[in-house]
């Protein structure tokens, strides 16, 4: 299937910009930024790599490898940000606390941050970390879109049932401000829907000529 979303070309030319250990090392706070967050082993790096058609984000058999804010440029004004993964038991507590402080500082200060993509493993959705991110997004009036990753690990019927269940739980606890979809990196499931969300947040219009 040929995807025609206007964000597709930009994602395909994404390039690594820099890694930041703290907010004052981030790029200039201007333009459009979309951040990707998720508990360790939720498939965040794989999702980013699939969306950009590249191996930009580091994947590892050891969850929790992303320890920095990693910025990827789409053009002069637009960026994707890979946030630190959380929850892996082998990461020392002091390092976890360090990540948490700098994540909170980033989320609370970036004027250019236009939306947050939250990855949830469809087999283990709505973890404590996910609930914290949902609470923060609603309190901060930050648009959030959830990818239920690894949807290929379930049958389509089971995946759809989980989607509806999580959707209902989110609507009950947080209202209609959060959108959600199924996603699979290896099967390339849900790409068009995710691209549409990114294009909207980054204020891209479909410039395809009328037929």
Swiss-Prot record:
Domain of life, per lineage: Bacteria
Keyword Membrane: no
UniProt lineage: Bacteria, Pseudomonadati, Pseudomonadota, Gammaproteobacteria, Pseudomonadales
Keyword Magnesium (UniProt): yes
Gene name, Swiss-Prot/TrEMBL: engB
UniProt protein name: Probable GTP-binding protein EngB
Pfam families assigned: MMR_HSR1
Occurrences of domain EngB-type G (ranges): 30-204
Organism of provenance: Pseudomonas syringae pv. tomato (strain ATCC BAA-871 / DC3000)
UniProt-annotated binding residues for Mg(2+): 45, 66
GO MF annotation, one: metal ion binding
Family (UniProt): Belongs to the TRAFAC class TrmE-Era-EngA-EngB-Septin-like GTPase superfamily. EngB GTPase family.
Residues annotated to bind GTP: 38-45, 64-68, 82-85, 149-152, 182-185
């Amino acid at each position: 299937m040929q995807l025609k979303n206007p964000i597709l070309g930009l994602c395909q030319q994404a390039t690594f910009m820099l890694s930041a250990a703290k907010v004052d090392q981030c790029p200039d706070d201007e333009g459009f930024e979309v951040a990707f967050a998720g508990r360790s082993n939720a498939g965040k790096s794989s999702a980013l790599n699939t969306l950009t058609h590249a191996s930009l984000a580091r994947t590892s058999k050891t969850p929790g490898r992303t320890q920095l804010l990693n910025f990827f440029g789409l053009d002069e004004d637009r960026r994707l940000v890979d946030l630190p993964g959380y929850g892996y038991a082998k990461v020392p507590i002091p390092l976890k606390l360090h990540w948490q402080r700098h994540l909170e500082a980033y989320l609370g200060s970036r004027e250019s941050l236009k939306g947050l993509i939250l990855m949830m493993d469809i087999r283990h959705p709505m973890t404590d970390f996910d609930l914290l991110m949902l609470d923060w997004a609603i309190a901060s009036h930050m648009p959030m879109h959830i990818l239920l990753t690894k949807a290929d690990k379930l049958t389509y019927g089971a995946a759809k049932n989980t989607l509806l269940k999580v959707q209902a739980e989110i609507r009950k606890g947080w209202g209609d401000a959060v959108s959600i979809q199924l996603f699979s990196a290896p099967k390339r499931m849900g790409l068009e829907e995710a691209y549409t969300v990114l294009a909207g947040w980054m204020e891209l219009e479909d410039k395809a000529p009328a037929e």
